[in-house]
Amino acid sequence: MKYLASSQSAILWMSVLFLLATMAYWAAVLARSVFAARSATRMTWAAVALGLSGLLVRWHESYLMGADIGHIPVSNLYEVFVLFCMITALCHLYYEQRYRSGRSLSITTAASTATATAEPDVGAGVGAFVLLVITAAVGFILWYTFERGAHEIQPLVPALQSWWMKIHVPANFIGYGTFALAAMVGCAYLLKSHGILADRLPALEVLDDVMYKSISVGFAFFTVATILGALWAAEAWGGYWSWDPKETWALIVWLNYAAWLHVRLVKGWRGEPLAWWAVIGLLVTTFAFIGVNMFLTGLHSYGSL
């Protein structure tokens, strides 16, 4: 009974539901199944709820180990990958609901029911791709759990014993989650623009709009997170910026998406170039988050594998 009520159990069930939701979304796309699409959405919501429950229970468990050990569960790769899965899924669910509602309105006011029926499901078309990146994160969580025992709660290293962590890390991962969502929507855009699954994916205009709005939200939160990180660094190390590898790559990520938004808003770019850019941007962001921890050393080395 103790295991069933543990944070590890909730997070493992979250992982299972995300995997099932991914399969259901793809079934909805390939078979055009409304039932599969609705089931996928419900499983995604359930997975998010279990992930949140797991993190809250883990927070409580850390305090049961000792008041000096207790901390908000955003301090290591295991915890932040769970957070990443939740945030990315929530962002997808928001856009799914928003565009499904808009589609329902257009269907209601449209004269032709036959045309509306043939229209691809927005939620399934986007979810099938977004859930792939969540599945990759789930795979990492499972590997990290069983191979490295990462689910074990550890005391915070001195550098993380700060209230700044409670706001810097979540803001960062809203950025990461929305950047990941934009990249996967970019993949869907590229496939549809080349005639692959063209009749089963949402309109290019919808995909382009989701991609743009996701990067806009992500850029705003990533900017806030970077500023908070600089303030935290000033308190912890005596300087706002030290050109640590993590800081340098965070700046590269920020400049990348600043340029993306600039060419869209000022230069009027649309379509495939920005879709490719969003996909490549995720690779840059992934290296900034994981690659730096694996291959480079610096003040942020406490986040290594």
Language-model segment annotations:
Residues 1-305:
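Polytopic transmembrane helical bundles with strong interfacial aromatic enrichment
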